[in-house]
Design a protein with these regions (language model features):
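Enzymes that bind and transform nitrogen-containing heteroaromatic metabolites
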Residues: 1-145
Length: 145
């Protein structure tokens, strides 16, 4: 298995735009990683102010229209990197084509839902998978329409 840095670089190379919600973005800022190298960062929040975060684009309204415009523009794939509420909104608007889920072999007994309620049922089609020596299973799906 290639080193983690090589796998991470390969993942990052697919994308030129990253979308995050406020609750995902704030820990990124605290960790000194408000942006990802080579990617435009869009933060979806009704409370953050653009002038406080000049290195990213803060989207306060019209999330669906913003993402539709990003999808229509030329470029690489768009990465929704955390933000369950944002994921639900974009999924319900038909703006999610595919998703990748990593199953980590640790039972937490609680946590944040992948798709918070209320949400409609969505059918997925498995398109790929990888099993790592660590026990992590990476599953790739397309969203059925």
């Amino acid at each position: 298995m290639p080193p983690a840095s090589m796998r991470r670089d390969a993942i990052y190379a697919q994308f030129d735009t990253i979308l995050v919600g406020r609750r995902t973005f704030e820990p990124m800022v605290r960790a000194g990683r408000a942006t990802m190298p080579g990617m435009k960062t869009f933060v979806f929040s009704s409370t953050l102010r653009q002038q406080d975060y000049p290195d990213v684009t803060v989207v306060g309204e019209n999330a669906e229209q913003t993402v539709a415009a990003l999808r229509a523009a030329s470029g690489k794939d768009i990465w929704l990197f955390g933000g369950g509420e944002l994921f639900r909104r974009l999924l319900e608007a038909g703006l999610v084509d595919a998703m990748e889920v990593a199953i980590i072999p640790v039972l937490l007994g609680g946590g944040i839902s992948l798709l918070p309620p209320p949400s409609k049922q969505t059918t997925l089609q498995l398109t790929g998978h990888r099993i790592y020596a660590t026990g992590i299973a990476a599953l790739e799906y397309t969203v059925s329409t």
